[in-house]
């Protein structure tokens, strides 16, 4: 059971994400408009992958079988007062990964993950979507969500990618000769911020734990998940992957990136 310790965590100045403060809530009523805090935490994780096989080298162990389902569950306990930790919190997260073979139609990879922050915590300890702020493709991240755009204390995410293995492109002689491969990806995020962690509610005006959200942070509508769709080509020169990503909703905000192009270099044999 590893223990991690953050010596100091800087928190930027706290402001509302909306122009008007809610009734009963003023900046003076909230502690820590600009603050530093420490966290001390213990983390334990269990992983179960029946049928998974490996090759062992002197430096590391490499997976050679990606067909086995992988189940993980972990819990993080923040300890107040231990090594200077300022907050007590409990965060639980679980995930499932599975690959499905579609015969001549290639393969589908599915990754489902969810988590809950059980305690009232300042916003840096809330759940932030795993975002990719670069132009390099990163697995199991959202490509068009900005950093800290959505803050939740419970979430579920789904990543699905379907590699057609040339089933469509092989019908086009030039693409068949080039051995390019097509794929489609879908990403979905459901999130909710419960009342106990919402600093915009008057009932939390006297909280000595909550902090105001920075500008640009938003509260998701639990009735409307976030969606992304991607269309890609890989195996270009057996090396280059290119994909077009489109954000399907939550587009009515200033500065939102509705679409983009991402790249990756990965050797394919």
Enumerate the predicted regions with their spans.
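Exposed, low-structure sequence patches enriched in small/polar residues
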Residues: 1-269
């Amino acid at each position: 059971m590893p223990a991690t310790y953050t010596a100091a965590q800087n928190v930027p100045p706290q402001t509302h994400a909306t122009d008007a403060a809610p009734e009963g809530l003023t900046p003076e009523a909230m502690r820590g408009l600009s603050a530093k805090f420490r966290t001390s935490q213990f983390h334990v994780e269990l992983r179960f992958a029946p049928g998974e096989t490996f090759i062992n080298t002197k430096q590391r162990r490499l997976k050679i079988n990606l067909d086995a389902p992988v189940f993980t569950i972990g819990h993080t306990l923040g300890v107040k007062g231990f090594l200077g930790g300022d907050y007590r919190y409990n965060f639980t997260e679980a995930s499932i990964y599975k690959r499905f073979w579609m015969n001549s139609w290639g393969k589908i990879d599915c990754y489902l993950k969810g988590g809950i922050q059980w305690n009232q915590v300042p916003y840096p300890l809330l759940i932030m979507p795993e975002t990719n702020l670069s132009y390099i493709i990163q697995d199991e991240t959202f490509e068009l969500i900005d950093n800290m755009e959505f803050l939740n204390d419970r979430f579920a995410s789904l990543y699905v990618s379907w590699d057609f293995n040339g089933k469509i492109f092989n019908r086009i002689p030039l693409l068949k000769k080039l051995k390019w491969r097509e794929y489609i990806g879908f990403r979905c995020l459901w999130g909710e911020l419960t009342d106990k962690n919402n600093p915009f509610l008057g009932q939390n005006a006297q909280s000595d734990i909550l902090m105001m959200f920075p500008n640009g942070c938003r509260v998701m509508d639990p009735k409307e998940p976030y969606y992304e769709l991607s269309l890609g080509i890989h195996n270009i020169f057996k090396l280059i992957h290119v994909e077009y990503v489109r954000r399907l909703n939550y587009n009515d905000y200033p500065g939102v990136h509705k679409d983009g192009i991402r790249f990756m270099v990965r050797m394919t044999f």
